[in-house]
């Protein structure tokens, strides 16, 4: 999934540069600021995922559904369907909640340049909440497994 996201993002970024759909305003320092947010997001997500697998996963015995014996393609498909549904409503909720809007999500909508990199322009609290929600959906709700025996 991560590799797919990187490839899609890179292709979209190249297409934006080579075949722009609209002209973007010049914003001094935007590229550096956006790159810093992307780096921060990657470090934060990696840290949360490592902490999850070090501390939560070994002691977690609760799975609402147990997909660990299912094929990886089925786990990925079920996770995609569930997370797409949940994240749609979670996104709507961040727009409707004054607290979440002001403290996290407003930053994502603040840039004057709307482009692929803006996807990653998020407040660290929002990144942490999204990552924990995604991990919870995958491993607690669905009981997905990282065990290699479920590859078939």
Pin down the residues of each PLM region.
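Specific transmembrane helices
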Residues: 1-63, 68-88
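Membrane-embedded catalytic scaffold of the fatty acid hydroxylase/desaturase
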Residues: 36-48, 70-152
